[in-house]
């Protein structure tokens, strides 16, 4: 692993772009709606379905597990893999922590409301409207939510996720300094130039969409 070299190739306006995105997110009233789901609740924790508004006014959803015993608890926020089916936290164990499992826009619990088609290619010709701009902001809104809850110990908010969830974990931890730790594994959506040279998928989908949109590969990479 020490021999792997991947030069930095971020755009000059990278941080300005994400700072503006965070500013726009902060202007969206979250309108949290928290509904107990009795069939998912158990002996140790209650499980709730949460709805909230994210960047661009998009409604996103997730499952929130809270120990029945009163107290302040650390929170683990889980970001899901690409097209993964949303699972609920186990309500009969892990009484030492809260858990929030987020479905980003168009995926998981939000699949019935998906307007993005092939998520990772949506808006590929315009970084302002690219799918993962909003999806990355969804990860921050999830952190906003857990920190808004009285049961949360604000000193101990942890992020984790694999594949797409690993990428979302890295993005959220980079953009939000309120978190205490992050555990990404097999992260997807990174180092695209090398990635697409090594394996066919999903580069073949991106290349086909670039042709469909009439943009060059370099323009595509600038969005990514």
Language-model-detected regions and their locations in the chain:
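Hydrolase active-site cap/lid region
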Residues: 166, 170-219
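Alpha/beta-hydrolase fold nucleophile elbow
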Residues: 151-162
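N-terminal targeting or regulatory segments adjacent to alpha/beta-hydrolase or S9 domains
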Residues: 1-45
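Serine-hydrolase catalytic core
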Residues: 221-224
């Amino acid at each position: 692993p020490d021999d792997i070299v991947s030069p930095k190739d971020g755009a000059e306006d990278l941080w300005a772009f994400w700072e503006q995105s965070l500013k726009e997110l902060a202007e969206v009233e979250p309108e949290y709606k928290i509904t107990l789901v009795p069939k998912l609740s158990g002996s140790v924790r209650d499980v709730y379905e949460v709805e909230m508004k994210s960047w661009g006014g998009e409604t996103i959803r997730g499952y929130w597990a809270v120990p029945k015993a009163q107290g302040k608890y650390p929170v683990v926020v889980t970001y899901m893999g690409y097209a993964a089916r949303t699972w609920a936290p186990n309500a009969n164990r892990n009484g030492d922590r809260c858990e929030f499992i987020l479905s980003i826009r168009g995926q998981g619990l939000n699949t019935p409301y998906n307007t993005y088609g092939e998520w990772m290619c949506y808006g590929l010709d315009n970084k302002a409207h690219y799918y993962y701009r909003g999806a990355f902001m969804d990860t921050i809104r999830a952190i906003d939510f857990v920190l808004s809850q009285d049961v949360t110990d604000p000193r101990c908010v942890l992020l984790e996720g694999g594949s797409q969830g690993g990428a979302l974990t890295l993005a959220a931890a980079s953009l939000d300094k309120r978190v205490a730790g992050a555990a990404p594994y097999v992260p997807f959506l990174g180092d695209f130039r090398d990635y697409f040279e090594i394996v066919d998928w999903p580069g073949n989908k991106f290349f086909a969409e670039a042709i469909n949109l009439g943009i060059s590969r370099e323009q595509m990479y600038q969005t990514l």
